[in-house]
């Protein structure tokens, strides 16, 4: 018997229709966040935009922060796909700098969406933890693309350290961009400095 303070979560695979409905909800939330920021992503408005009953939204997501964590995964995945498909400088530090600066540019171009995703990622809601994990995983993809996949335990440890440090610098820069009125150029300069110092 499980101790009384243990939480057990059961999951089941979604049918094709359920998966399509869930994706439609995430797309609706992404559109609302892009149009009006965090405050625009209410469960009621997401349901209306997706053309489903409000109860349907709660069947898939526990809160708007949970929903925005999925928006984060979708949007950041699309941005990283675009970054990794670009022609990059051959030198690893230059390649890393180019990718991080482009990520800042895209975030500035979609400031309301960036603000919504960051607000969810820094929320105390436990269901939004996936947002932070998505952010770190995306940074890992950037590092792998720019620097190559590490092949020794020492290189893997160094890559983990780089991911941790650059992740904090990037998060701080994006919060400055979306919440404190910093310009895209200021945040790009911050990323250039960070890469120069850690590389």
Q: Model segments located where?
A:
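Basic, helix-initiating cap at the start of DNA-binding domains
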Residues: 1-36, 40-49, 66-69, 74
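Hydrophobic/aromatic residues within well-ordered alpha-helical segments
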Residues: 21, 64, 71, 75, ...
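Short hydrophobic clusters on alpha-helical segments that form packing/core surfaces
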Residues: 25-33, 79, 103, 170
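Short hydrophobic/aromatic patch on the recognition helix
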Residues: 51-61
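Hydrophobic alpha-helical connector segments
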Residues: 70, 84-109, 163, 188
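Amphipathic alpha-helical packing segments from all-alpha helical-bundle domains
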Residues: 80, 125-168, 185-196
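Short secondary-structure transition hinges
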Residues: 98, 105-141, 153-154, 175-176
């Amino acid at each position: 018997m499980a101790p009384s303070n243990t939480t057990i979560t059961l999951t089941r695979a979604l049918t094709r229709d359920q998966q399509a409905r869930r994706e439609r909800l995430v797309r609706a939330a992404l559109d609302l966040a892009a149009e009006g920021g965090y405050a625009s992503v209410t469960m009621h408005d997401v349901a209306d935009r997706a053309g489903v009953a409000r109860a349907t939204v709660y069947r898939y997501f526990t809160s708007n922060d949970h929903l925005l964590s999925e928006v984060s995964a979708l949007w950041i995945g699309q941005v990283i796909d675009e970054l990794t498909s670009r022609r990059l400088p051959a030198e690893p530090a230059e390649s890393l700098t180019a990718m991080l600066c482009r990520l800042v540019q895209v975030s500035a171009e979609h400031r309301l969406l960036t603000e919504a995703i960051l607000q969810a990622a820094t929320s105390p809601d436990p269901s939004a933890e996936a947002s932070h994990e998505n952010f770190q995983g995306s940074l890992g993809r950037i590092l792998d693309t720019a620097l190559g996949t590490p092949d020794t335990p020492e290189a893997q440890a160094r890559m983990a350290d780089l991911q941790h440090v650059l992740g904090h610098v990037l998060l701080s820069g994006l919060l400055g961009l979306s919440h404190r009125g910093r310009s895209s150029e200021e945040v790009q300069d911050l990323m250039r400095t960070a890469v120069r110092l850690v590389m």
